Regions:
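Pocket-lining segment of extracytoplasmic ligand-binding domains
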Residues: 83-85, 93-95, 122, 159-248
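Extracytoplasmic small-molecule ligand-binding "clamshell" domains
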Residues: 36-72, 78, 235-236
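Bilobed "Venus flytrap"/periplasmic-binding protein-like clamshell domains
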Residues: 23-51, 55-56, 111-178, 288, ...
Length: 312
């Protein structure tokens, strides 16, 4: 009888400890380990863990679409997402067949570049040249998958016109290095580690001209963007492409005080983030062209610093 009692007490203690650990852990939804969401999520977790009474844990995911589903279903608490994908998820439009809500914005962080990599000696010089080629369009539930489909369509192509693969950045870069892939799409801050690691062997394809104009007009969220020369080894010229804003979001169930503290720590430590290296990150950038309401905790911080944002 005593043995059974001890086992029960031990089991209850473990359950209580596990529950406490879960309750006091904030899950951060990021992306591929060789993408910028994961890198910046790791930086964010390190800063917050040094300035908080809870533990912030980085979670690898497929990317924006997955993060929006996960935060809506309460599997993660804060997440990095593309603004264009976020807007579609929030409103149940685009590639989303229903609304995914339960989250609000903390801050717009930086502009991600839509990058299309091909082998350096390839005869592919335009998106139009991808017809019949093996192309990674991005992982399922990633933001890049939505971008790649839209861009192919703008050039008169679709998934059935290419040998479509759905790989992570890491796996796509590995496949290209091994000669098993003709091209891959990557939407991420630059430089992106997955591309940096093979930069001597690849070139980037531009998205420019009338097609870029049409895409920015058709889809709210795209902006014209330049990948500056020498961003990657061997890249001697600017590459004109499109960009989308990265937004950090928080679950609506997270307390106002917690989100206010997160927001404050981001701005107090902005010099420690890789995404702030080009000096474009400030309160104006963080709050402009964010297409969903802000969390009340973030709003409180902005208001105290003279910036008003919508919360509903």
């Amino acid at each position: 009888m005593k043995k059974v009692l001890y086992i029960l007490i031990a089991a209850i203690s473990i359950m209580a400890f596990s529950g406490c650990g879960m309750k006091n852990t904030v899950q951060i939804g990021t992306g591929d380990v060789n993408g910028t969401y994961y890198a910046y999520g790791t930086e964010l977790a390190e800063i917050l863990n040094n300035n908080s009474d809870v533990y912030f844990k980085v979670r690898k995911t497929a990317g924006s679409a997955a993060n929006l589903r996960l935060i809506s279903q309460e599997y993660v608490d804060i997440a990095f997402v593309q603004s264009d994908v976020m807007k579609d998820a929030y409103n149940g439009t685009g590639y989303f067949d229903k609304e995914y809500k339960g989250y609000s914005a903390i801050a717009g962080l930086y502009t991600e570049a839509i990058q299309v990599a091909v082998p350096k000696d390839s005869d592919i010089n335009s998106i139009s040249d991808l017809y019949g080629k093996s192309v990674s369009l991005g992982e399922k539930e990633s933001g890049v998958l939505q971008n790649s489909k839209q861009i192919l369509s703008a050039y008169g192509l679709n998934e059935s016109m290419v040998d479509a693969k759905y790989l992570s950045y890491t796996d796509a870069a590995k496949a290209m290095k091994n000669g098993n892939l003709d091209a891959f799409f990557c939407t991420a801050g630059t430089p992106t580690r997955a591309i940096t690691e093979i930069s001597d062997d690849i070139k980037l394809i531009p998205i420019d001209g009338t097609v870029a104009n049409r895409l920015t007009e058709q889809y709210n969220g795209y902006v014209k963007h330049t990948i500056k020369a020498n961003t990657y080894d061997g890249q001697t010229e600017d590459i004109e492409t499109l960009g989308v804003k990265t937004v950090l979001i928080a679950s609506d169930k997270m307390s106002d005080d917690r989100v206010k503290s997160i927001t404050k720590n981001i701005f107090d430590n902005s010099n420690k983030f890789g995404f702030a290296k080009d000096d474009t990150f400030d309160m104006n950038f963080a709050t402009e062209n964010v297409t969903i309401p802000f969390h009340k905790g973030a709003s409180e911080y902005y208001a105290e610093n003279g910036v008003n944002v919508e919360t509903e």
